[in-house]
Amino acid sequence: TVSEEQMRKEIAVMKRLNFNAVRTSHYPNAVKWYDLCDELGIYLVDEANLETHGYGGQLSASAEWTAAYLERATRMVLRDKNHPSIVLWSLGNESGAGANHAAMHGWIREYDKIRSV
């Protein structure tokens, strides 16, 4: 577990190096990370817990996986929607492209008409 002190140090280094945004790749980070980004002025690209490396678009194109894909999108958005630092919702990492990604995108667009997807 990364301490709040360490998170603050990492954000301070990023700001010194003129970074203004980070991506929460592969999975959601600790809630405190989102809070600190809100407080300290770092933009976030929040990424759904979705990575299907090696499967290409097979799972994203399969109706058997639609509910699982949508659950990951809805969990992310409902959990993190009140963080002003989030500027973009990411549908996942190296997870192909297909109907299930389109369903995720559609749900997020309907729910959050402000942020990019």
Put a short name on every predicted segment:
Residues 83, 111-112:
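Acidic-histidine catalytic/liganding microenvironments
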Residues 1-103, 117:
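Active-site-adjacent substrate/metal-binding segments within catalytic domains
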